[in-house]
Amino acid sequence: MVESSRNAHLWIVGSGIAGMAVAAVAIRDAGIPGEHIHILEQLGIAGGSLDGAPSPKEYAGWVTRGGRMLEEEAYCATWDRFDSIPSLEDPAVSVRQEILDFNVRVPTHSNARLIDKNHEILNAAEYGFNTADRAELMRLLALSEKALGARRINDLFSEHFFQTNFWQMWRTTFASQNWHSATELRRYFVRFIQEFNRIHTLSGVRRTKYNQYDSLVVPLQNWILDHGVDVRFATRVTDVDFSDSAGSRRATSLHIDTDDGKSEIALGENDYTFITLGSITADTSFGSNDTVAPLIRDRVDRSWSLWDEISKKETDFGRPNTFYGNVDENKWESFTLTMHGDLLLKRIVEFSRNDPGTGALMTWVDSG
């Protein structure tokens, strides 16, 4: 550890998997003392989109807002990070090895990837491409991001492509909509091109043993806390001040809002800040069996409003409005089922011919 690392303080905005990974890498690879690392989180729980907590609306219910299907060819940084984080069940085994061992015992191979409106399982191995679809796919991959510009996916593909089995599987695996960015789709195609020939079974997926809050977030959180990291919940960062000198820009202070009032954290010469902006689960609202989740349109969540404030300072901080400007085209819904019996689980197993944990995703292609 060099002296500059010993004196450095890290201020991390957001306790999602990215923020906690920064803390863990700083301790493991840079030798920064855990006591010099501070995580500021507006919620009362860590994990970001991978959080897991009792439902605020439904008695005896549980909510996980997001999830991630891992695979061995991608997520290299994730595998590296969790290779040195001990499993909760067996500290002699890393979280990475626990996941890989679990997938040897419980491999993913969907037998019911697509279901039609007549409750029939479709032959998902038939992707449904015609010659025009293949040509349009090749054109998307061949074009540069500059050439694609602001075009949408439906600007690049004909209607037939959106009716193919391939698109039904791809869009429900990666949460793509026809009107989303063509550039974003191209990035996904390039990153996950190895999934093209197995997306009908999702056999490339590596699942965590339990939900990802318990299998990933909790072990990582425990590890950084054991190393002395300072985690502050209910702490909202509302703005960041910067200074520019000799062509170098650095953050100089963080504006903080807590239940106790407003304050500022001054950042010294040896301080660094890492900020998570624009979460896909920002402005989450909750419903129940009897109530509808309200739609939030005014960016209550700080991950977007903070980016708004920062972007006003310099144009190269990006344009967050590009992503949140049309709420109706970017909102999404999810459901977390809390079951107190196994009847539904047995029915799903009987219908899909997949034991629990082996089927990954089931898509009802006529559901909207």
What are these regions (language model features)?
Residues 191-272, 277-278, 290, 296-300, ...:
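Helical element adjacent to the flavin cofactor pocket in flavoenzyme catalytic cores
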Residues 22-35, 223, 227-229:
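A short, Lys/Arg-enriched amphipathic alpha-helix followed by its capping loop at the start of a domain
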